[in-house]
């Protein structure tokens, strides 16, 4: 009788634990998750914005291939269900996606390990008479992107300066999302970095915006902000870094030339967000 009593009591105790919040039943064992320790560092630190340079169906096929992937794909005009735009999640956030490639930002490399990638359906650019013409982004696509990006930033406490373009982290290889991506609009929504106009004017110090400045001095500022700048860069490679910065923060002119306005923007950003 006593043995029966203890068996019943043990069964009731186990049943209570099984239904208790924070107790997870596994095959052959039970997990108590009610006490959580602080991780050494959060894995996700960077949010990377891309464009697909293709239509939606082709983009979806490419991003579900074995060679390349992204966590999210946002259609140019997202279909709406129950009044909300639909976004495709292709890789769970806790898993790595192959979206960044060879990349570097703020001293870190292998950014696939520490980032979430969002691909935007967009045709990219077409070249005519030696000039690249970038495709605009649909307003509905940007409106769908905003709550997704806000969600990700809030979950992982991503800093504004770590919301970046693919071109920012791989300027020698990539242009996306290009100069028509509305970085300033997103910054007004709390997504990403943007310089204060008054501070840009302060650092411009009365110079004409396109006054040439020393390239090495500008690159030193960009390196402090987070760009991958190496001492043995060719002039073309130097221009690619400057152009990536300009497409993000001065999209009206992104010729890769070192000028006073680009320098002033870099100084204003460093003042506002700190350096690498």
Curated annotation (Swiss-Prot):
Residues 1-16 form the signal peptide. Substrate binds at residues 51-52. The keyword Cell wall biogenesis/degradation applies. A lipid is attached at residue 17 (S-diacylglycerol cysteine). It is a lipid-anchor. SUPFAM superfamilies: N-acetylmuramoyl-L-alanine amidase-like (SSF55846), PGBD-like (SSF47090). One of its GO terms (molecular function) is zinc ion binding. The active site is at 119 (proton acceptor). GO terms for biological process: cell wall organization; peptidoglycan catabolic process; peptidoglycan turnover. It is found in: Cell outer membrane. It catalyses: Hydrolyzes the link between N-acetylmuramoyl residues and L-amino acid residues in certain cell-wall glycopeptides. Gene3D superfamilies: 6.20.370.150, Peptidoglycan recognition protein-like, PGBD-like superfamily/PGBD. Keywords: Cell outer membrane, Cell wall biogenesis/degradation, Hydrolase, Lipoprotein, Membrane, Metal-binding, Palmitate, Signal, Zinc. Its cofactor is Zn(2+). Binds 1 zinc ion per subunit. Its EC number is 3.5.1.28. This is N-acetylmuramoyl-L-alanine amidase AmiD. The gene is amiD.
């Amino acid at each position: 009788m006593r043995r029966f009593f203890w068996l019943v009591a043990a069964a009731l105790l186990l049943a209570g634990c099984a239904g208790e919040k924070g107790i997870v039943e596994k095959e052959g064992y039970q997990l108590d998750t009610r006490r959580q320790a602080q991780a050494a560092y959060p894995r996700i630190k960077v949010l990377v914005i891309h464009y697909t340079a293709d239509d939606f169906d082709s983009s979806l096929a490419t991003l579900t291939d074995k060679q390349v992937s992204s966590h999210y794909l946002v259609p140019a005009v997202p279909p709406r269900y129950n009044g909300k735009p639909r976004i495709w999640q292709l890789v769970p956030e806790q898993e790595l996606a192959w979206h960044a490639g060879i990349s570097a930002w703020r001293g870190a490399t292998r950014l696939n390990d520490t980032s979430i990638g969002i691909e935007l359906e967009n045709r990219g650019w077409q070249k005519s008479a030696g000039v690249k013409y970038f495709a605009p982004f649909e307003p509905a696509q940007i409106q769908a992107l905003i709550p997704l990006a806000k969600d990700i930033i809030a979950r992982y406490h991503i800093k504004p300066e770590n919301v970046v373009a693919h071109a920012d982290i791989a300027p020698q290889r990539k242009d996306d999302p290009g100069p028509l991506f509305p970085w300033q609009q997103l910054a007004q929504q709390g997504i990403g970095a943007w310089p204060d106009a008054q501070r840009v004017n302060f650092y411009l110090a009365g110079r004409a915006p396109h006054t040439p400045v020393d390239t090495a001095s500008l690159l030193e500022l960009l390196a402090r902000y987070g760009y991958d700048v190496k001492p043995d860069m060719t002039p073309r490679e130097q221009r690619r870094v400057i152009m990536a910065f300009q497409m993000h923060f001065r999209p009206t002119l992104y010729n890769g030339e070192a000028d006073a306005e680009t320098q002033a923007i870099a100084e204003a950003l460093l003042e506002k967000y700190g350096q690498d």
